[in-house]
């Protein structure tokens, strides 16, 4: 069976995945001082951080649209999986679920599953690795979902921040203050 893994741009794609059509990143949009910056392969983190430091307003982010997820899901793969930034931090999960529903209205038998990573960044990448491992081992669609959901339940992600300024000014996550 063929498969595809879609991951929002908060997750990290391995170099080998960037060349593999079974993996696709969908970009979040970051806004600083009225400027929209797409978090894609052209994203310049140093420039973005300078803009954040120079801007008195809190930066904002926007998740990929349901239509963008729908386009990513619309492929020939038998099994399609999405790994999103934690639903507690972003609307990316809800957007992916809506994109799945939109595509399944047109293709009712399409097997798509959206994982709420309950994590970010490398945590999402580790989940994508687990999906790949399960698919390469020949697991059924249902067994991949069961195995990966158990993996997510046992996963713990810790973050180290240079400073807490963005956490204090950002409206999410809500319970960080």
Locate predicted features:
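Active-site histidine-anchored catalytic micro-motif
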Residues: 85, 91-157
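Single conserved hydrophobic/aromatic residue that forms the stacking wall/gate
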Residues: 168-177
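N-terminal glycine-rich anion-binding loop in soluble enzyme alpha/beta folds
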Residues: 4-65
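Short coil/turn connectors at secondary-structure junctions
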Residues: 1-3, 21, 77-79, 108-111, ...
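Glycine-rich phosphate- or other oxyanion-binding loops that anchor nucleotides, phosphorylated ligands
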Residues: 53-98, 145, 153
């Amino acid at each position: 069976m063929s498969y595809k893994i879609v991951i929002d741009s908060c997750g990290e794609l391995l170099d080998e995945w960037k060349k593999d059509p079974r993996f696709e990143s969908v970009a979040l949009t970051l806004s600083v001082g009225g400027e929209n910056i797409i978090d894609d392969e052209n994203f310049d983190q140093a420039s973005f951080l300078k803009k954040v430091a120079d801007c008195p307003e809190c930066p904002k982010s926007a998740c990929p649209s349901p239509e963008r997820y729908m386009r990513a899901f619309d492929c020939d793969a038998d099994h399609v999986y999405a790994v999103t930034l934690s639903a507690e931090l972003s609307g990316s999960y809800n957007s992916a679920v809506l994109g799945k529903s939109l595509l399944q209205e047109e293709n009712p038998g399409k097997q798509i599953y959206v994982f709420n990573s309950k994590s970010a960044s490398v945590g999402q990448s580790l989940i994508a690795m687990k999906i790949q491992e399960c698919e390469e081992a020949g697991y059924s669609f249902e067994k991949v979902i069961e195995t990966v959901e158990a993996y997510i339940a046992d996963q713990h992600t810790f973050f180290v921040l240079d400073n807490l300024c963005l956490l204090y000014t950002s409206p999410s996550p809500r319970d960080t203050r």
